[in-house]
Amino acid sequence: MTIAGKFPPTGCRNVAGFSLLELVVVICIISGLLALAIPKLWALQVEAEKVAMEQVLGNLRSAIGIKVADFLVRNDMAGVRSLTGSNPMDRLSEVPSNYRGALNGANPDTIAAGNWYFDMQARALVYRVRNQDYFRGGLGKPARARFAIRVIYEERGRNTNEIAGATLVPLEPYVWVDKD
């Protein structure tokens, strides 16, 4: 066996791989794309939290509306009034997976961000915000929003005690902000 059979001729090299310059160019392109994508992905995460919170609030308002309609059909105004200060989560057939229950004297610092709980002392439903830098209002640090059921009165003539319904309202104003 000759050596010539083991090595290809010098003019026909089969080079596998790529050069260092090509590697640097690919890394620069990928880094640039990531630099553009990461802020957008972060904004989507904040938007997802906002939408999830609003979806739970919408579900609660619908459930409260159904209960109010039930009371109004039976002309049970005391039943409507009894909703004030009650736990809105009790109106749902299935509570969200991030609901921690009714807590007596809960310390918000001990509740994980992104969770709901009912503060039995304040008679308020509380959401602990995960993306605190994008949330203004509520009760400060840790960022949280509180809600309670309130009866709505309708003014007809001189009678201001006519019940029109009940709804879930924020106890303090809040807003989600963009950090652009």
Regions found by a protein language model. Name each.
Residues 64-102:
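Short, glycine/small-hydrophobic-rich surface segments
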Residues 46-75:
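Membrane-proximal N-terminal amphipathic helix
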Residues 2-3, 11-45:
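N-terminal single-pass transmembrane signal-anchor helix
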Residues 89-180:
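Intrinsically disordered, low-complexity regions enriched in Pro/Ser/Thr/Gly and acidic residues
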